[in-house]
């Protein structure tokens, strides 16, 4: 029986690395995973997912206007797939999350989503909130704060100061380095205090 999985964490916990490991394991056993990602995230270029340690794999980059159910149904009709793996699920829409549930329920294909639970403002991404409600299986991918506690928040740091207002979606790419901006995974206490090191 296929299931809808949501594997979530703060940044830098290894979500994409886990996705790549799962894809490898499927392929190593003669199975066919379909890897999808958001076209918003261009760090690895379009049609590719890449972990922070440098491992990458081809993928299909979709926009928030794409119908994922139709895409998977069409792809599956000519290339039988055994699993759908989605990176950066927080960049997709709630409607697309329901389409993923439809893939599980109607096509009987497992779907494993990887993404952030909250943005740097401490607010849940809409898709993450929906997945927390409807996914069959929830799995937290853990990482740690600089203090050693579990990191569950993402802090945006600009010019050495924690940012707590602005656009809730800011992609972590090379352009942020130009304006001395970075993301840091921290525990709740240090997120509230704005302490990142």
UniProtKB/Swiss-Prot annotation:
Signal peptide positions on this chain: none
Catalytic activities: thymidine + ATP = dTMP + ADP + H(+)
Family matches, as Gene3D superfamilies: P-loop containing nucleotide triphosphate hydrolases
Binding positions for ATP per the UniProt entry: 9-16, 87-90
Localization terms from the record: Cytoplasm
Entry's Gene Ontology molecular function annotations: ATP binding; thymidine kinase activity; zinc ion binding
Zinc found in the keyword field: yes
BP GO annotations: DNA biosynthetic process; thymidine metabolic process
Top-level taxon of the source organism: Bacteria
SUPFAM superfamilies: Glucocorticoid receptor-like (DNA-binding domain), P-loop containing nucleoside triphosphate hydrolases
Disulfide partners: none
Active site: 88 (proton acceptor)
Name this protein carries in UniProt: Thymidine kinase
Organism in which the protein naturally occurs: Francisella tularensis subsp. holarctica (strain LVS)
């Amino acid at each position: 029986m296929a299931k809808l999985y949501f594997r979530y964490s703060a940044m830098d916990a290894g979500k994409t690395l886990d996705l790549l490991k799962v894809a490898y394991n499927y392929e190593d056993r003669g199975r066919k995973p379909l890897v999808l990602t958001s076209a918003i995230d261009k760090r690895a270029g379009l049609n590719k997912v890449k972990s922070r340690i440098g491992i990458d794999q081809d993928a299909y980059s979709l926009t928030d206007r794409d119908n994922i159910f139709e895409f998977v149904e069409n792809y599956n009709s000519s290339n039988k797939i055994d699993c759908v793996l989605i990176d950066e699920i927080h960049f997709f829409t709630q409607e697309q999350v329901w389409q993923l549930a439809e893939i599980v329920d109607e096509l009987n294909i497992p779907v494993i989503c990887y993404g952030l639970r909250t943005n740097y403002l401490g607010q849940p991404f809409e898709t993450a909130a929906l997945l927390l409600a409807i996914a069959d299986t929830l799995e937290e991918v853990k990482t740690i704060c600089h203090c050693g506690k579990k990191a569950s928040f993402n802090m945006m740091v600009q010019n050495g100061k924690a940012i707590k207002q602005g656009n809730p979606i800011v992609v972590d790419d090379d352009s942020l380095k130009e304006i001395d901006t970075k993301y840091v995974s921290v525990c709740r206490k240090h997120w509230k205090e704005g302490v990142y090191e």
